[in-house]
Amino acid sequence: MSIILGIETSCDETGVGIVSGSTVLANEVASSSLRHKPFGGVIPEIAARAHLEYLPNLLELALETAQLCIKDIDGIAVTAGPGLVTSLSVGVSAAKALGLSTGTPVYGVNHLVGHAVSAFLDDYTNDGLGVIHRRDSIGSNGIENDASSTHSHTHTTQVNRHSNLCVYTPPRRVLRDVCKYMHVRDSVVLLASGGHSCLLKIHNNKISLLGETLDDAAGEAFDKIARLMGLQYPGGPAIEMLASSGNPNAVEFPRALLTHFEEHNRYSFSFSGLKTAVGRVVERIKSNPAHSIPKIEDIAASFQEAVADVLTAKTVAAALASDVDLIVMGGGVAANNRIREMLCERAKIHGLDVKIPPIALCTDNGAMIAAAGSWLMQLGYNPSHSRFSPVSIMPLTQMVV
């Protein structure tokens, strides 16, 4: 079974993962989100500099976690697009350098394909075969904030004095010949993140686009509404926390393209109108704080409910029309518990199965890119040309460059 190294640097998260087939051997993630927080959004130059700082240490940590050396790697997968070109360039350059120096084939893969297939990775959180070790920000002198995922197993954590990072030490790895192949089932995939909101169809190992956002992505809407409310970046977790104590039925916000739409927009999304409607309510409260009805918690809950309603209703409708029995959800917005809950409830009514990756795999990470590379290698795709370049826009029809 081939062992694939995955590198992810499409936005503000740096990820290095290692998989063998569908088995996660390592997954190291660092985020520069704390550096962007004062600006209320991602600053491309800051993100790119953070990737340069994080990537060497994460590569070292991933190999150590997997108990491998670079010569054990059979293929390198790296996000080639879509994303911020300055950020993508860091990962692509690193992958090319590794590939050239070791003679290992390099696959420049589509970021969205990584999200789509991440749900088909084994449940490494329960079987001791892998790890998500997430560092929300790494400063030049060490860790600013460590948000590692929890595990049912007890393992040791030690400090690497050279990199000044925490290193997860797992149990001894299984041999590559007992790992399973990536088995990607026919399904409808909902991808929702800060940069993308789209519905995909996987059929016979091919991915096609059913619909996408016509304006703002769902995650982008969360960030913008959070900014209007005076909440911290990133907005998704902040709004979800606020919404937990609010009434989701307090305000009837619009659900664009949900009941009245043209046929070609049946599976498309639009969140700009919802964003405007929420903004008006927030501004009304700010202008008259003595009469703050509805409460800010109710606004957050009602906004979240509207987003969940649109995303899940269209996804279930697409699955029923596509004659598949499986729905997959990925992307950072898939970490929202209310959206996950509503999708599972609606799918169950129609007898549909739902696969959602562990929350740590919903956000950008290297394991999902390694998984995409593993899948594409299984399907017989050729490595990318040595001169390939990262691109900000990459159609789904182009799974590898």
From Swiss-Prot:
Substrate binds at residues 191-195, 223, 236, 336. Gene3D superfamilies: 3.30.420.40. The keyword Metal-binding applies. Fe cation binds at residues 111, 115, 364. GO terms for biological process: tRNA threonylcarbamoyladenosine modification. It is found in: Cytoplasm. Binds 1 Fe(2+) ion per subunit. Signal peptide: none annotated. One of its GO terms (cellular component) is cytoplasm. InterPro entries: ATPase_NBD (IPR043129), Gcp-like_dom (IPR000905), KAE1/TsaD (IPR017861), TsaD (IPR022450). Keywords: Acyltransferase, Cytoplasm, Iron, Metal-binding, Transferase, tRNA processing. Its main location: cytoplasm. One of its GO terms (molecular function) is N(6)-L-threonylcarbamoyladenine synthase activity. Its cofactor is Fe(2+). It comes from the Bacteria. The keyword Nuclease does not apply. Its EC number is 2.3.1.234. It catalyses: L-threonylcarbamoyladenylate + adenosine(37) in tRNA = N(6)-L-threonylcarbamoyladenosine(37) in tRNA + AMP + H(+). Required for the formation of a threonylcarbamoyl group on adenosine at position 37 (t(6)A37) in tRNAs that read codons beginning with adenine. Is involved in the transfer of the threonylcarbamoyl moiety of threonylcarbamoyl-AMP (TC-AMP) to the N6 group of A37, together with TsaE and TsaB. TsaD likely plays a direct catalytic role in this reaction. Belongs to the KAE1 / TsaD family. This is tRNA N6-adenosine threonylcarbamoyltransferase. It comes from Tropheryma whipplei (strain Twist) (Whipple's bacillus). The lineage of its organism: Bacteria, Bacillati, Actinomycetota, Actinomycetes, Micrococcales. The gene is tsaD.
